[in-house]
Amino acid sequence: MSPLIVGTLIIILLSGLATAFYVTWQGRLICAGVGLILEQAYEGGQMFNTLMAHCFETYNGVEKSGTQCVADWLKVGLLAVTFGAGGPRLVNTLGGTFLTSPTAKRSNLYCDDFTGADYFSCELETLRPYTLMRKSLPYGNIHDVWINTTDTHQMIGVHMTLNGTDMIHYYNKTYVINYSGLKLNSSAINKRSYFYPQDSFLVSHAEWQDGNGIWTDTDYFAAMADCDFLGQNLGFWLASSYPNAYKWETQLWRTVGINLNGNIIYPGQLIMQTFNGS
């Protein structure tokens, strides 16, 4: 077979694959590309920024036309886990903590005070039960992430230190960890905090007021990229410990973990399998 024919066949094959990716699901090819370059993204930064720039064009939670690909593979829910009448089940595995409940209409947010003491809870409302995993991170201002392993493997919460204060952020509320309990941060610190965009990235936006009454803002966020690639269910947990990361500056991202067909893999080793119990 001549080199010309071989080259033509290769071009046709590659074109067909590219077309199939695009037609099957907008954003899937981008998602696969993000997965393949993830480890290099926070070193070089530029390729990841280029892939995402035309896809993520949202500000303050308002998605612009043509950015539905973001919603297809970046999902964020609430930091919440439901409890049945018998209370929560706590399952420890090789490096992860699962909180599970089969049924409940009223729920608690079940949180560690991060001092090794007993767990405690604060009341929340949720619509459905979750299997929740907490994984500690070894760097920066983001210390722990929570992942919904029940079905979608979404990143659903983050524990971080912001302005010297340990906090758990989820949706519209901020809880301050004061090492003796968990309280809603309503008056201890003069600040405003919220998440945006709620359907794409988990963004903790905090606005701080100084002694002169001037407000400044800081953003930290975590994200979840989830997609199918060549029949493999891949999920990539990303987190940034830098402020204002939504600007897509370089060297912001770290790979938190990879979900490969139900196996949650962290850099260098297999930590645990997804817990699917009730």
From Swiss-Prot:
Membrane-topology annotation of the record: Lipid-anchor; GPI-anchor
Protein location: Cell membrane
Entry annotated with the keyword Cell membrane: yes
Domain of life: Eukaryota
Keyword Glycoprotein: yes
Keywords assigned: Cell membrane, Glycoprotein, GPI-anchor, Lipoprotein, Membrane, Signal
Chain residues carrying a lipid of type GPI-anchor amidated glycine: G96
Signal peptide segment: 1-20
Propeptide stretches in the record: 97-278
GO CC terms, sorted: endoplasmic reticulum; external side of plasma membrane
Full protein name: Uncharacterized GPI-anchored protein C212.08c
Organism: Schizosaccharomyces pombe (strain 972 / ATCC 24843)
